[in-house]
Amino acid sequence: MSRGMTTEGASLTAAASSSASTWLTESTPSTPSSSGSSYPALSTFSSCSNSASSPDEADPMSEMSPKISVASMILLKDMEEFLHLYVSSANMHPSNFVRHHIESFDDMLWNEFPAMVAREKPVSVKGYRVKFGTVRYEPPCPDGKPWEKLTPAMARRTDATYHSAAVCDLTVTDPKGLETVYPRLELCKIPVMVGSAVCWTRTEGSPLPGECPSDPGGYFIIKGKERVVVPHIRPAYDQPCVYKNGDGWLCEFRSVNRETRQTVLVQAKTDCRRKLEFSLPYIKQYVPVGLVFKALGKTAREAVAMCGLGSFLGDEVSCRTVHHQSMAALLMEQHASAPEDPVADLAKHVPDGRSVYSKQAEGAKQAKYADRASVEEDRNAKGSKEDYVRHVLAGEIFLHGGDAAEHLGWMVKRMADAASGIGTCTDRDDLANKRVDATGPLIAFLLDGLLKQYVKLFVKSAGCQKNLCPYTVLQNSMVMTNSLHMCFATGNWTVKRLGPPSYVRVGVSQVLSNNNYGARVSHLRRIMHAVSFRGKNIRMRQLHSSHYGFLCPYETPEGEKVGIVLNMAEGAGFSLETPREVVLATVRLGKGLPGFFEGAPARLAWSGAAGSASVDVDGVLCGVTGDPVGFVREARLCLPGVSVVWKKVEREIHLLGCQGRFVRRVLDPEGIRGSGYDSPPAPEERDIEMDPAPSSSPSDSLPCPPGVYVCAQELSVCSLGDGEYADPPASEILTDAMSSVIPFYDHTQSPRNAYQSNMGKQAIGFPAVNCSDRYDATLHRLDYPQKSLVDSRSVKRLGFDEMAHGALPVVAIMTAGGFNQEDSVVLNASSLDRGLFSCVTYRTVSCADKRRTKYDSEVVCLPDWGLRNREWDYDLLGDDGVIDPSCAGALARRVEGKRKAAKRPAGQRTGGGPAGLCDALWIPAGTVLVGKVSHSLGPGGNPMRRDVSLTVKQSEEGYLDRVTVDVDSDGKKLVKVRLRTPRHPEMGDKFASFTAQKGTCGAVLTQEDMPFDKDGVVPDLIINPHAFPSRMTVNYLLQMCFGTAACKLGKTYDATAFEREDVVRDIAEAAKEAGIDCWDSVLHSGSTGRRLPTKIFMAPCPYQRLKHMVSGKMHSRTHGPTDALTRQPVAGRSREGGIKIGEMEQWCKISHGASESLKESVYDMSDKYEVPVCKECGRISDHFEYCRMCDATDMSLVKLPYTTKILFQELRSIGISIAFK
């Protein structure tokens, strides 16, 4: 996500910006991700800016004049009007909420993966030379049918994986020198993100059949299941980090090689008095910093200057503080005491190979050095250790590039600044020091390891073949496809590598929540720390000041995941990568940016005058500028996708183009941020084969929200509202999807907002328009969703007004007799009969043919009479073994007989599918939906057949809604049967308001028994007034007040947080406009007709019905299956298990004196058992007639649970004997 996007009146670009645009477009067309654009699609908004001035027509004074935006010249008279413009234009397309997923995935497709293949060196095996060509992608199609189109709806219906084939050219040179080019080599099949550049939903341009128009995309379809890749937060690399270490200071620098993805951590520590040490890579012992500088060929004066500790005036050192002076003296002392051959002295600290490098670690080290330099076999010899030290000093200290001595000096400077108070310690929890591995980097991590594994397996397989054809071997290899799909299906993100086992990220890919539309959007914006949930790091879980505008403070789960699993704020996202080469090319452009001296050592800025600053690009020191103000101003204009961070006190300017930076929208009224250069046109997305365009951004066609995007690190050093940037309203950037729709969430306590953020995801709503075409295992749908009369702006922006997940009952706040209403609500039965809160639950049963071996298979068919289960009903099966609703005779029996047993009215319509035969067909428990026979080998090797048909369980009864017979991705028969069960509200069901007033249904009263007012208005819901003092949900009452006025005036009211200066005055004005004299109403009792002694507050208030329903949890049994080992009833309602009697139930029955009831629960109805016990020795005997221990014949039967008998046997096996007295 980039920060360079401006509002539709983009800033006029100066000559420097225009020349940058021209140079980059002409000179670097093939540079990966040269634009660095992501969220703000530059091609959408840059035409206005770049066409305003050209290099030939530029005004000579334009470089000196400030950049003023068109919006600020024409429309914006003051900041209040600018905020109004921002808010009025903030209605975003649904795809904007998942833009961080889509653009990250597109960047991986067009830039990262082609670069991996291009870096792969030609492979030589048996005289053949194999070279991979340009990567391109084919549109999604069914396996083995490239002429057909595979849409997301088809993938869901057929349980297929929605993927695209990544193909390339393959050039093979045989031993005779003959070159053959194969135009299509399939490397792998990459799962395609819905809504990405290669998805049919983007290439077709209009909603496809079976797709929801409001579907934001951003997820994958793996074996018919929708799965989302959750981004992971990690520490930032390639920057020095200073921490307090006891009485001293510790500086860490973790560098990463972007091509090989290898990392190295080096540390420097000091106490500013006697110790100044540094750790070399792969050497566990710390060595003096002065010794390292001398080994790098630097003098003492150069070392002091590189560390920014001071400047030399003759033989004296001029330092900024006492700490700088003491560290400079310590550094010069270490340099002077170092031997003449510092490399030999460092070699003494290299441990012996036998004590450090095991065979496994040695192999891993050899593989790690394979691409850079070889390591001598004998590390014990003196010469090999010195060569090893030289090799480490040359290129192993800082893998990201740059001069090792300068970066070592940078680390020492940071420690000196922190010790003297000039600088500050690094805050580990600050988002400025965090990066996010989004969907693209996570998949690229897998592809990088799998591509190497793909080549290694090719070399291994080719070496074993006589008549070798390299193309055939590579084409038949499925290692990349299978491993990718396995990682997506399981969520375990890892690649098998040589050496010690690597870290496995668990839960990266998750099944997408589809309970309602809000839960879907919220899950797509989820983010998590790459740590264990059981970690005891409290500070990581707490809120941080840097989270403002980036992470939602409310939306986090309870329990062990609190603070680890988070949600992005509404205006936040992640940046894409702008390559370091592109940034350096722009900095060097023409005469360069103001005052920039390329290659100048950073010591000139750190130890020189105060008017200069060092410049680094993603952690690589590249020069010095003598005009920091002008440099920063021009850099922000020419590099809109790069963060320009100027630390004035430290005299450092950081140009950050790395991917994964936290960015968020801010206002740019002064036009500080330029629109940059035009991106080259995106590839034609309607082509059958899509060639990668490395410098293009295929997601530029997505609509862009207004504002500019600034990263957390830049916001930490700039001053918002002080001439640089301005913050949008807090209501637009503070919260995420589920919490932003809470009405007046600034008028309630914080825990209530957190509760509603989680309860809103459990509410039953309208998850998608294409519910009739979906075959989820369980899907809830509210029959009559209603829009609220009082809601926030986010409701319309998120689309919750069209995809609602609540209803709008008339609520009365009263005790209503108080019966069973401690924390519950009373519902109006007549309102429920009219459809209030009624919903439908869809359950899909899926079954497919399976053929594992010749004698191990499962076939969908009509089971023979001899195989059938006597307790099951096969009457509705057709000749093909699939339920057939057109069976007239069975249907007549079902409608007449089973309807009476189920006590349901004939011909009842419950919604769901088209009216027809299936609407009247009620499927009771025990009915076979799909006949299936298993074929296997018996104990004697004889073929066996067994009936494994799919039946309706006791808790899954419903109306037959739809039956589909299809073919899965393996070409086997796939049957899906969907049942529809109406769920009307009943006692025990959970309901909650949008302000987190949760309660169960305590009573359902008829309309005649409910109170009524003089106009005959009867409340639909009654809530206990005692629910308000402790929960303090003032926004509940505000919503009811404005709702009453909205009903009388026929309009809606805005409930956006932080928008009303005086809400009491606004309520009074609304009441005056609606003609309301008093908010309370005079009600009469429905049972007696008498007037109630007090006035009652009654008004419409939106409520949600949660998915926790009594009909889905109620369960009982008299007998059923038991566990084979313990002989206790199995657990689980779906398995017809028993009811658990836990410790609390046990003590409850004891306190009531119900000992017989307790005995019946834990013994008689559980694992009742009797054992023979000898009356002489008291031991359990294995015979009922006599005891083999003491030869006694006097035996008795003792009753005890079977699990207790197993426990006694286990104790006896370890020598502990149990005797009964």
Swiss-Prot record:
Positions the record marks as coiled coil are none
Among CDD domains, the record links this protein to:
RNA_pol_B_RPB2
Binding-site residues for Mg(2+), renumbered to this chain:
D823
Note one Pfam family from the annotation.
RNA_pol_Rpb2_7
Low complexity compositional bias, start-end: 1-54, 692-701
Q: Which GO terms describe its cellular component?
A: DNA-directed RNA polymerase complex
The organism's superkingdom is given as Viruses
Keywords, alphabetical: DNA-directed RNA polymerase, Magnesium, Metal-binding, Nucleotidyltransferase, Transcription, Transferase, Zinc, Zinc-finger
Positions of the UniProt region annotated as Disordered = 1-63, 673-701
Binding-site list for Zn(2+): C1174, C1177, C1187, C1190
Which Gene3D superfamilies does the entry link to? 2.40.50.150, 3.90.1100.10, DNA-directed RNA polymerase, subunit 2, domain 6, RNA polymerase alpha subunit dimerisation domain, RNA polymerase Rpb2, domain 2
The terms under GO molecular function for this entry are: DNA binding; DNA-directed RNA polymerase activity; ribonucleoside binding; zinc ion binding
Q: What does the record give as EC number?
A: 2.7.7.6
One GO term of the biological process aspect: DNA-templated transcription
Among InterPro entries, the record links this protein to: DNA-dir_RNA_pol_su2, DNA-dir_RNAP_su2_dom, DNA-dir_RNAP_su2_hyb_sf, RNA_pol_bsu_CS, RNA_pol_bsu_protrusion, RNA_pol_Rpb2_2_sf, RNA_pol_Rpb2_3, RNA_pol_Rpb2_7
Catalysed reaction(s) here are: RNA(n) + a ribonucleoside 5'-triphosphate = RNA(n+1) + diphosphate
Zn-finger regions (C4-type) at which positions?
Answer: 1174-1190
This chain's function reads: Component of the DNA-dependent RNA polymerase that catalyzes the transcription of DNA into RNA using the four ribonucleoside triphosphates as substrates. Second largest component of RNA polymerase II which synthesizes mRNA precursors and many functional non-coding RNAs. Proposed to contribute to the polymerase catalytic activity and forms the polymerase active center together with the largest subunit.
The similarity annotation says:
Belongs to the RNA polymerase beta chain family.
Q: Report the protein name in the record.
A: Putative DNA-directed RNA polymerase II subunit RPB2 homolog
Naturally occurring in which organism (per UniProt): Frog virus 3 (isolate Goorha) (FV-3)
